[in-house]
């Protein structure tokens, strides 16, 4: 997951950036996750990769702030796609976690690109609130998520056909 979610975007950016800098206006969009701002039990490697991607996008946005390259970061919550295997779908159902249709995420991407130069956008309620709270009061989020830990562990032990996006 680190290679796909973090190393590949960094390497691709390194190759594309000289071309993008030749234009008056260009954009880089990094698609992260709510889990790039909130460490979630059962998804340590995935969260680490998305935390890294968010940090990379934030740093690059600041480094390129005096250029024509706009750096954006989109953080969807769970999205209903084929990338989610049965374990993730079942876990989300058990936790009552909403899963957005890809068209919702696409709409959020368009809104991100229409917004301020170089910005972040978090998708979904209450996830976007949790991201903000986690930034200033992480222990509060720890307490809120602690009640879900037994469910996460139960699903981690069950046998489901695995997918590459799952822990």
Question: Which ranges hold each PLM region?
Answer:
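C-terminal helical subdomain
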Residues: 73, 93-131
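Residue(s) in the substrate-gating loop at a strand-loop-helix junction
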Residues: 33
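Active-site helix of classical SDR
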Residues: 13, 49
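Alpha-helical segment proximal to the catalytic Tyr-Lys
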Residues: 18, 62-63
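Active-site loop immediately N-terminal to the catalytic Tyr-X3-Lys motif
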Residues: 40-44
């Amino acid at each position: 997951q680190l290679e796909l979610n973090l190393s590949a975007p960094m390497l691709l950016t390194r190759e594309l950036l000289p071309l993008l800098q030749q234009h008056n206006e260009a954009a880089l969009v990094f698609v992260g996750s709510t889990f790039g701002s909130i460490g979630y039990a059962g998804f340590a490697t995935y969260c680490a990769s998305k935390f890294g991607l968010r940090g990379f996008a934030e740093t690059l946005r600041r480094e390129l702030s005096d250029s024509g390259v706009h750096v954006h970061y989109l953080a969807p919550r769970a999205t209903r796609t084929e990338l989610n295997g049965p374990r993730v779908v079942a876990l989300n159902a058990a936790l009552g976690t909403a899963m957005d249709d890809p068209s919702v995420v696409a709409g959020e991407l368009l809104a991100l690109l229409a917004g301020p130069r170089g910005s972040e956008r978090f998708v979904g309620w209450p996830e976007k609130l949790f991201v903000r709270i986690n930034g200033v009061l992480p222990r509060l989020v720890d307490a809120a998520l602690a009640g879900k830990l037994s469910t996460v562990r139960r699903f981690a032990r069950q046998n489901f056909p695995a997918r590459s996006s799952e822990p």
